[in-house]
């Protein structure tokens, strides 16, 4: 079995600077508006292509069975869309992005897989040309293929490049795994009814996360704890990760030391580009 030299890729996390949920579509997805930026919190994926015609995926943590794994689904979609047969590859995933946190770890891994496959099999393809394929894998996969901070509409696949002023971000995550489906169907979800202009700057007074009310209703004790911290933590995606942005790294370090609950914490930077 001939093996090609292994190639490593980084797979970055994202945050939603705001997330407005609009109407439900006939395909079951919801239209939305959001502003994505990236974090220097990242997974590492190593791809070793070979002629085995087998797809093997391993990780440093427990991951979904092959048929339910977004990385595997990305490979199959790539095969079907571009008629690339007999893919043989060993993929090793080193996870650092927490799962079920709203940071897009699984979607990011799927996008990285599409890019690795493109680099090996179809290097003439641009990232933008793969966005329609990415959208078929999930609402967040497109932004990771796009690779730049962006305003997003549709289900997240209509993207407009929009930089965000780089800052530090303190992430905190309770030991809670969120069901996205449950949050979308929650009676506590109050959907946004008014579109806002993508030309606006970051405005906390009109830009919020519609899922925060759902989270706070389900986990009122965590909501109370955030109030006690007296800081403007915001939720990314459907949670359960919250973030606080600041240009002052020391301020965030001091706050992190003040947090006495058993929460996972990261101090990271925002990024406008990941490719």
UniProtKB/Swiss-Prot annotation:
Record: active site: 14, 140
GO terms, molecular function: 4-(cytidine 5'-diphospho)-2-C-methyl-D-erythritol kinase activity; ATP binding
Annotated InterPro entries: GHMP_kinase_C_dom, GHMP_kinase_C_sf, GHMP_kinase_N_dom, IspE, Ribosomal_Su5_D2-typ_SF, Ribsml_uS5_D2-typ_fold_subgr
Identification of the protein by name: 4-diphosphocytidyl-2-C-methyl-D-erythritol kinase
Pathway noted in the entry: Isoprenoid biosynthesis; isopentenyl diphosphate biosynthesis via DXP pathway; isopentenyl diphosphate from 1-deoxy-D-xylulose 5-phosphate: step 3/6
Species per Swiss-Prot/TrEMBL record: Francisella tularensis subsp. tularensis (strain WY96-3418)
Lineage of producing organism: Bacteria, Pseudomonadati, Pseudomonadota, Gammaproteobacteria, Thiotrichales
One Pfam family matching this protein: GHMP_kinases_N
Catalytic activity: 4-CDP-2-C-methyl-D-erythritol + ATP = 4-CDP-2-C-methyl-D-erythritol 2-phosphate + ADP + H(+)
UniProtKB keywords: ATP-binding, Isoprene biosynthesis, Kinase, Nucleotide-binding, Transferase
Protein family: Belongs to the GHMP kinase family. IspE subfamily.
